[in-house]
Swiss-Prot record:
Protein name: ATP synthase epsilon chain, chloroplastic
One Gene Ontology cellular component annotation held by this UniProt entry: chloroplast thylakoid membrane
HAMAP family hit by this protein: ATP_synth_epsil_bac (MF_00530)
Subunit composition and interactions: F-type ATPases have 2 components, CF(1) - the catalytic core - and CF(0) - the membrane proton channel. CF(1) has five subunits: alpha(3), beta(3), gamma(1), delta(1), epsilon(1). CF(0) has three main subunits: a, b and c.
InterPro entries registered for this protein in UniProt: ATP_synth_F1_dsu/esu, ATP_synth_F1_dsu/esu_N, ATP_synth_F1_esu_C, ATPsynth_dsu/esu_N
């Protein structure tokens, strides 16, 4: 038995295919979803989406959003998402370094919050790449 997973962002469809299982980062922690999972609607946190295909795992860097699971259908509406193999490692590392520098230079609460979110997004992209190479 399989699940149908659809991952959408404001710009494009990232994924629309059958999968065996997913591991999703939510605001209350990670959840694993197998066929016949109980229906749920949840906020999606900035983090990794792990997708199990027949014999391998695929990783997606998710930038937050919303997920709905019902009747073996999973729909994720993401603020942004990138499949790990599409991420340029050098660019991701540079973005992480810039985000770290911006956080240390942040003045005021708003700048600190924005810099912290940018840092979380950058770390997620780098983490997605590391999953490929390990």
């Amino acid at each position: 038995m399989t699940l149908n997973l659809c991952v959408l962002t404001p710009n494009r469809m990232i994924w629309d295919s059958e999968v065996k299982e997913i591991i999703l980062s939510t605001n209350s922690g990670q959840i694993g979803v197998l066929p016949n999972h109980a229906p749920i609607a949840t906020a999606v946190d900035i983090g990794l989406l792990r997708i199990r295909l027949k014999d391998r795992w695929l990783t997606v860097a998710l930038m937050g959003g919303f997920a709905r699971i019902s009747n073996n259908e999973i729909t994720i509406l993401g603020n942004g998402a990138e499949i790990s193999t599409d991420i340029d490692p050098q660019e991701a590392q540079q973005t992480l370094e810039i985000a770290e520098a911006n956080l240390s230079k942040a003045e005021g609460k708003r700048q600190a919050i924005e810099a912290n979110l940018a840092l979380r997004r950058a770390r997620t992209r780098v983490e997605a790449i590391k999953v490929i190479s390990s």
